[in-house]
Amino acid sequence: MKKLGRKSVIRQTYESVLNSKLFDEICVITDSKLIYNHLNKINFNVLYSNTQHDCGTDRIAEMSHKFDSDIIFNIQGDEPFIDKNGLIELINVFKNDINNKIQIASLMTPILDYKEVSNPNIVKVIIDNENFAIYFSRHSIPYSQEKKISYNHFKHIGVYALRRKSLKNFSKQGKTSLESIEKIEAIRFLEMGYKIKMVKTNKTTIGIDTFEDLEKANDLLKRKII
């Protein structure tokens, strides 16, 4: 419920997604009474989950029966600067997948500052030659002894597009071992054998996980850099 500019972070995120005009329906699913009451008061579409889930994807799976779409987006509430073009690219992944082979897609952005590579609050992803995720980690992957950018490092952005079936299977599986260690929900899909198509976006984005992130985001907002 921290403020970004004059609005809460979750409200900024909701309005960014709403203003993209890409989705048939937008809904916040939360287990926080504070967030529920805040969004309900301003007439935003919000559902309350009484169940304590380990991650947002599990909450969405719980409420997925309320939505008709075969493709469901999970946009984490701490992504107020989400890139519309990145969302369009994720939609196009499924539009172009005529054989329905891709079950999950997500966003990544290049890391240009080595401090971010070594920052455990930033989730890194390594990919194969077809842009499918090999692994996600809070650690530096791949590790470089040179302590500088010597590889195309990518930061994972907290946005997923999923087919309904994969979402349900994710929830049925329950928390997996590597997911528990890293505290990264995307790893559960990998441990289940799913391939995650990663889409690159060059748009500057800040996931607000810490007070320092919030300060940086407010500064960029004031200077209208984002």
Question: Language model features by range: what are they?
Answer:
Residues 27, 33-92:
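Short phosphate-binding loop-to-helix
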Residues 82-173:
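Conserved core of the sugar-phosphate nucleotidyltransferase
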Residues 23, 69, 99-102, 194:
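Short, high-confidence coil segments that cap the C-terminus of an alpha-helix
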Residues 1-5, 47-49, 175:
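Short glycine-enriched, charge-decorated loop/helix-capping segments at active-site entrances
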